[in-house]
Amino acid sequence: LQPLNCKKPKDSSLGKLGDFFFKNNFLSGDESVSCKTCHLKEHSLTDGNSLPIGVGGEGLGQDRMKSKGVLVKRNVITLFGRGDNSYINFFWEGRVELGDDGFIYSPFGEYLPEGFNNALAVASAMPLVERDEFVGGGTMDSGNILSEKLDDKYYEESLEAFNQMIP
């Protein structure tokens, strides 16, 4: 076995931005879930369930199964080692994949914003647009509400780090 070639982020402000988004639930439609809700250290960065509970859930790990949240139809993948370049596809159905041509194929298609430079980055954005995971049963105005949340809660240092990602 060879060790994975996982690289630590070069820019600590970018790492702080990722940590900020990972831990905060304001990106979910009803503010009930964050990335950290389902990627728990005590369960090897999964939730410990065969299928997770998304928006509307309460508690962590198996306690979420007792809540009235929405059941998500796929399991939570671990995040350990996923930064290695050998991981070129994500999700069991291959929803996000780095092609031989260097293009990252995903449901975002040609609308993928600039700044996503690997399959893991694209895969990490997928839950944010999934109704059962983050979005919830909102209205057509949900996108505007999310924009307002970002405007209201964005930290200055996080904004600076985000701007470093945009060419």
Model-derived segments and their meaning:
Residues L1-P167:
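Periplasmic c-type cytochrome electron-transfer domains
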